[in-house]
């Protein structure tokens, strides 16, 4: 099967996984929150991060579907970042992927909460992964937090905000992008390798492939 065909299958699988996960909450008292979350989460996108997670899992020798909890989790984190990035206090964007942004439909307060919930729910989903080495769950959670948090994606957004009034050097641009965009892609690849039961040698090779990262990522 070609990479294009596998990518299409990966994309469809993670879409179904995310829909199934949130279907259980449709009758919850806070259903308006879930509507806001699903509006952005299931509103299209290339699903590059899940594709990386699935492919690295496959390359390490296990059924690629074993990476589904991690693949879904990184897409949830990515979506939260887009919702918050579009807010008036950030980029103040009215449209995303050809549709009105989350806060334009549901209001700023609900958009903030939808992003917050996606970020925290991502860890709940990731915890469902069945790993060949259960001790790797601590590594996986640490990678997610590091790459999404202040050393990674959030830190990159801060640097982006701080730099808006001046011209950046090439190195500064690369640093921002490696954190704001690259860090979560790094995490997706590493999480896929973990789900695939990667040997220490395979895991190190994965880290070399995804370098640079906010800081060295190692197994616990």
List the model feature ranges, each with a label.
Residues 92-117, 166-183:
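Divalent-cation-assisted or electrostatically stabilized phosphate/pyrophosphate-binding catalytic cores
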Residues 126, 140-150, 154-173, 187:
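Amphipathic alpha-helical interface segments
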Residues 52, 122, 156:
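Residue-level signal for inorganic ion chemistry
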Residues 209-216:
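Conserved small/polar residues in nucleotide/adenosyl-binding loops
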Residues 126-140, 164-171, 191-204:
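Inter-helical turn/loop segments and adjacent helix faces that build the functional surface
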Residues 1-77, 83, 89-91, 96-101, ...:
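Conserved N-terminal diphosphate/IPP-binding helix and adjacent helical/loop segment
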Residues 63-76, 137-143, 202-208:
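Alpha-helical scaffolds flanking conserved acidic
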Residues 22, 117-131, 144-150, 185-193:
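Histidine- and acidic-residue-rich, metal-dependent catalytic cores
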């Amino acid at each position: 099967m070609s990479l294009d065909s596998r990518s299409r299958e990966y994309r469809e699988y993670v879409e179904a996984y995310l829909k199934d996960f949130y279907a259980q909450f449709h009758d919850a008292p806070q259903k308006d929150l879930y509507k806001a979350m699903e509006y952005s989460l299931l509103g299209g996108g290339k699903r590059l991060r899940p594709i990386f997670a699935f492919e690295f899992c496959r390359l390490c020798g296990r059924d690629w579907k074993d990476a589904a909890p991690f693949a879904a989790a990184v897409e949830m984190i990515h979506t939260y970042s887009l919702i918050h990035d579009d807010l008036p206090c950030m980029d103040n964007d009215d449209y995303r992927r050809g549709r009105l942004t989350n806060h334009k439909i549901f209001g700023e307060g609900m958009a903030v909460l939808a992003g917050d919930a996606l970020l925290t729910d991502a860890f709940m989903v990731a915890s469902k992964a069945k790993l060949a080495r259960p001790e790797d769950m601590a590594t996986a959670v640490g990678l997610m937090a590091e790459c999404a948090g202040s050393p990674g994606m959030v830190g990159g957004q801060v640097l982006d905000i701080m730099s808006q009034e001046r011209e950046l050097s090439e190195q500064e641009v690369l640093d921002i992008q490696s954190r704001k965009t690259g860090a979560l892609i790094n995490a997706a690849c590493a999480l896929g390798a973990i789900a695939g039961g990667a040997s220490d040698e395979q895991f190190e090779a994965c880290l070399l492939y995804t370098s640079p990262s906010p800081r060295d990522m190692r197994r616990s």
